[in-house]
């Protein structure tokens, strides 16, 4: 009996610690907002871009899951530096969102994750609900002005 009580207490403690964490750090939100402004994304498309970041959750070079495995030759893998890589990956994802998202996650999922589109759309829907709940349905931070971000 004691083991079960201890297990429950540990589970509740870990849930409480996780509940205070943001899904996306403020620093990344600022970069996502900048990319979204540069690509003229709507608020709905900006939420989707943030959701892609959270769902893909890749390391530097794969932050938005663009281009398949590292070293595959895809141009989105130009940088291993976290800052540059985030912007390049985010720009590729933003372009895909801008050109192909029409309000239907299942249809978009077939484009973004063709191997598992239905599951991708289901997970994305859940992530979007969580992100919007964390921020009270408002995109975090101020909307930045457009600016060019160029890397050599």
Predicted regions and their residues:
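Catalytic glycan-binding domains that act on GlcNAc-containing polysaccharides
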Residues: 21-151
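Positively charged n-region of N-terminal signal peptides that target proteins for export
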Residues: 1-4
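Bacterial N-terminal signal peptides
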Residues: 7-14
């Amino acid at each position: 009996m004691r083991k079960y009580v201890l297990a429950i207490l540990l589970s509740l403690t870990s849930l409480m610690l996780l509940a205070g964490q943001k899904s996306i750090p403020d620093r990344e939100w600022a970069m996502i907002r900048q990319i979204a402004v540069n690509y003229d994304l709507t608020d709905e498309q900006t939420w989707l871009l943030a959701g892609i970041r959270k769902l893909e959750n890749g390391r530097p070079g794969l932050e938005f899951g663009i281009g398949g495995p590292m070293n595959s030759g895809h141009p989105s893998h130009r940088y291993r530096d976290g800052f540059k890589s985030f912007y390049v990956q985010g720009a590729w994802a933003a372009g895909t969102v801008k050109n192909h998202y029409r309000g239907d996650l299942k249809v978009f999922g077939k484009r973004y994750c063709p191997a598992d589109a239905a599951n991708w759309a289901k997970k994305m829907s859940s992530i979007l609900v969580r992100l919007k709940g964390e921020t009270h349905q408002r995109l975090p931070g101020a909307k930045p002005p457009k600016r060019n971000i160029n890397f050599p």
